[in-house]
């Protein structure tokens, strides 16, 4: 485990990895990866924590579970590997980004450049069976990702939580709003984007909070590959 995580996350979470629920989750994953097609690749499960250290987190964008189509998931919420078609929700995120800040829409869907700047792209469930959304829901991941939200909420340095849709907004109760900022709207899915996501300007609002705190803003524009 330790080699998959930044030291700062290991220090925050190492006790969690010793708990019985996590040991059970690990055993379940060993079976699932041996017998089923599971996404993302096992080496990519903790990419959100790998790319964005605990100390560097400025913004959190919460997702649900990984994309369940071949080659899509890369361990970062909403992000897909380069060369993979942009899923509908991600297309809508890029449309809002264009309207909000004026960024051109990139020719790929990888959000690694955000992660490297301090945007924690965290799904609440970190694995999924091919073609079966929510197939690893309720298996233990939520306890771990709740703990990740908790340790960020306990931090003195403010974090901006971007919560899109009801599933993400259920985590609001874990966030200390006397220290941290919440930006919320409907989900960018085609089913709900026109009911409040479009026009919500999450990217410029996040940068306004960062500048108010004396932090460098995020360069949300993603370069073509």
From Swiss-Prot:
Report the PANTHER family cross-referenced here.
URACIL-DNA GLYCOSYLASE
- Which Pfam families does the protein's record reference? UDG
Output this protein's name: Uracil-DNA glycosylase
Task: List all membrane-crossing ranges.
Answer: none
For the protein in the UniProt heading, the enzyme class is hydrolase
Q: Which UniProt keywords apply?
A: Cytoplasm, DNA damage, DNA repair, Hydrolase
Q: Name one GO cellular component term.
A: cytoplasm
User: What Gene Ontology molecular-function terms does this entry list?
Assistant: uracil DNA N-glycosylase activity
Query: Which InterPro entries would you find in this protein's record?
Result: UDG_fam1, Ura-DNA_Glyclase_AS, Uracil-DNA_glycosylase-like, Uracil-DNA_glycosylase-like_sf
Task: Give the annotated active site.
Answer: 65
């Amino acid at each position: 485990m330790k080699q998959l995580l930044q030291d700062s996350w290991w220090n925050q979470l190492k006790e969690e990895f010793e708990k019985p629920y996590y040991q059970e989750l690990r055993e379940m994953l060993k079976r699932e990866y041996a017998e089923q097609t599971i996404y993302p690749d096992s080496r990519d499960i903790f990419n959100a924590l790998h790319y964005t250290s605990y100390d560097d987190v400025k913004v959190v964008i919460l997702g649900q579970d990984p994309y369940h189509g071949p080659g899509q998931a890369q361990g970062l919420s909403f992000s897909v590997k380069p060369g993979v078609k942009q899923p509908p929700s991600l297309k809508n995120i890029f449309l809002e980004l264009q309207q909000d800040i004026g960024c051109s829409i990139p020719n790929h869907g990888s959000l690694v450049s955000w992660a490297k700047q301090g945007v924690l792209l965290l799904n609440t469930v970190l694995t999924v069976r091919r073609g079966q959304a929510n197939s690893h829901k309720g298996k233990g991941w939520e306890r771990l990702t709740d703990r990740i939200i908790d340790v960020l909420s306990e931090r003195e340095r403010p974090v901006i939580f971007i919560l899109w849709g009801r599933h993400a907004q259920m985590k609001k109760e874990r966030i200390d709003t006397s220290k941290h900022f919440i930006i919320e709207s409907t989900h960018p899915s085609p089913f709900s984007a026109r009911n409040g996501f479009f026009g919500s300007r999450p990217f410029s609002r996040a940068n306004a909070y960062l500048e108010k705190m004396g932090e460098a803003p995020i360069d949300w524009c993603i370069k073509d590959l």
